[in-house]
Amino acid sequence: MNVEVKEYKKIKFIVCFPDNFDKSQKYPLLIKLHGAGGRGDDITLLLRDSAFLKQREKFSSFPFMTIMPLCHENTWFDMWEELTDFIINAITFPNIDSERVYLMGASMGGYATWQMAMSNPELFAAIVPICGGGMYWNALRLVNVPIWAFHGAKDNVVLPRESEIMVERVNNFGGNAKLTIYPENEHNSWDATFSNPEVYEWLLSHKNENASQIIDIYNDIKKYG
């Protein structure tokens, strides 16, 4: 697994390249947002302790370009404009297939995953929020975004109802959301999710066919201001 540490403006981030990476090819992009335990300025902690990276190494083939930004503030929401700008910039990388951009996050990152998709539903082909929750009154904005949420039934940090109500509201509006509850899991529902190959197969089954038009607009904004 080829991993590099980079920085965009104030945000440090990890890039994981797919096996046999070819600069002439375009790859699906998986953006992964960590929980509160990963906050700070030391990106090496995220490298050493990332449950996602440890689980990712178990796969013989992992076709995604993966980007993992580091939250340098108290929460993702305290650097929301920075994070949004970072994600838009990442999506416009030349090796990214803009129709296959996916967002995943756990705990604090799960909340941010819900909110980022509600704020920018046109950017993502599908999302995977894990043990998070969100502003359910804005769920209509997710009606065209496929969602697979995960939560532990015994989670007393973020109650399962947080995921349940989001999924219910999205589906009430005619959306495509599903929820997996791990009956014996407490707050850590991410290890089981990260290690499940069906999650990545499900992500790749979704495409955002309107994304290229959106990316052209963002590229023009970057170029001309």
Label every PLM stretch briefly.
Residues 29, 33-83:
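Active-site machinery of serine-nucleophile hydrolases
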Residues 45-58, 85, 131-139, 161, ...:
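Alpha-helical scaffolding within the catalytic cores
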Residues 88-93, 99-143:
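Primarily recognizes the serine-hydrolase "nucleophile elbow" in alpha/beta-hydrolase
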Residues 185-193:
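Catalytic histidine-centered segment of alpha/beta-hydrolase-like enzymes
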